[in-house]
């Protein structure tokens, strides 16, 4: 087995055992990675998980999701060069870690690799695919965020240089990080499905959709040059409206999937 230099953090409250086992198993199938779970103290994960599914369990600091992920990432040893996190109900694609790490191994100027992401419903049925593309890394500064966080990989050195995750954001902290990362190197798009994002009512992203849209708008606007910010409302409100509509459509179609099972 090749040297393990990839670290994946899985934050969880320990309330979705079946999904969590599927998530951890998918990471094992995605490539050679050190898997660290961060969960509230006292959550009896050992009763539902076998030791081969993860490498380390860390206590959640209790300061929010972004703080928990950031804490766990900073706990990785110097041997870990590439990092990311994955929701406890999402999945990595087969061999996706090998696929995502290759461009960064070949070019030290590449600080992040992202690809396509499938949206699946509660039962794992495919709803649609976020195909993304090279354009997404430019679009996210003034339009919808189409850079898929699930399945991506980030160079840890660049993550730390960028200051890690902003603990002030509850939902859109990935967008804030991606924009900051561009100051330290290149973002590379690979045209392959790297992960599956589970769209269901219990998902934080789905349940907190309005707050996520609001945070993303704030992040995009603050990243603009000062002389452009005052004009941001011209395109921000139509964009926010469109994002909400897309979210409602995904919720609708995921509901249709459930009702026909």
Map each language-model feature to its residues.
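Cell-envelope/extracellular polymer assembly enzymes that use nucleotide-activated donors
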Residues: 4-7, 34, 176
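Conserved nucleotide-sugar donor-binding catalytic segment
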Residues: 9, 135-215
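Short alpha-helix within the catalytic core of nucleotide-sugar-dependent glycosyltransferases
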Residues: 21-25, 70, 93-106, 132, ...
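Short, acidic, metal-binding catalytic loop of nucleotide-sugar glycosyltransferases
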Residues: 22-34
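A conserved acidic beta->alpha catalytic loop
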Residues: 38-47, 87
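Glycine-rich, basic loop-to-helix element that forms the pyrophosphate-binding segment
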Residues: 60-78
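Short beta-strand-to-loop acidic/aromatic patch adjacent to the donor-nucleotide binding site
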Residues: 79-91
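Conserved donor NDP-sugar-binding/catalytic core segment of glycosyltransferases
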Residues: 91, 95-127
């Amino acid at each position: 087995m090749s040297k393990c230099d990839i670290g994946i953090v899985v934050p969880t409250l320990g309330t979705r055992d079946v999904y969590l086992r599927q998530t951890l198993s998918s990471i094992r199938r995605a490539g050679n990675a050190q898997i660290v779970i961060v969960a509230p103290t006292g959550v009896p994960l050992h009763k539902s998980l076998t030791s081969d599914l993860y490498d380390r369990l860390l206590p959640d600091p209790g300061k929010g999701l972004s703080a928990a992920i950031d804490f766990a990432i900073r706990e990785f040893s110097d041997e870990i060069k590439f990092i990311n996190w994955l929701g406890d109900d999402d999945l990595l694609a087969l061999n996706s870690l090998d696929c995502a790490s290759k461009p960064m191994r070949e070019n030290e100027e590449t600080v992040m690799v992202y690809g396509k992401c499938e949206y699946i419903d509660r039962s794992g049925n495919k709803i649609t695919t976020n195909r993304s593309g090279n354009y997404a890394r430019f679009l996210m500064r003034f339009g919808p965020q189409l850079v898929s966080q699930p399945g991506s990989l980030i160079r840890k050195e660049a993550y730390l240089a960028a200051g890690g995750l902003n603990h002030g954001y509850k939902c859109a902290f990935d967008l804030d990080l991606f924009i900051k990362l561009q100051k330290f190197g290149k973002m590379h798009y690979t045209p392959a499905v790297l992960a599956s994002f589970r769209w269901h009512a219990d998902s934080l992203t789905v349940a907190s959709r309005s707050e996520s849209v609001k945070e993303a708008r704030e992040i995009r606007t603050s990243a603009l040059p000062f002389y452009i910010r005052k004009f941001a409302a011209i395109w921000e409100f139509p964009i926010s409206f469109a994002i909400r509509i897309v979210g409602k459509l995904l919720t609708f179609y995921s509901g249709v999937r459930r009702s026909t099972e």
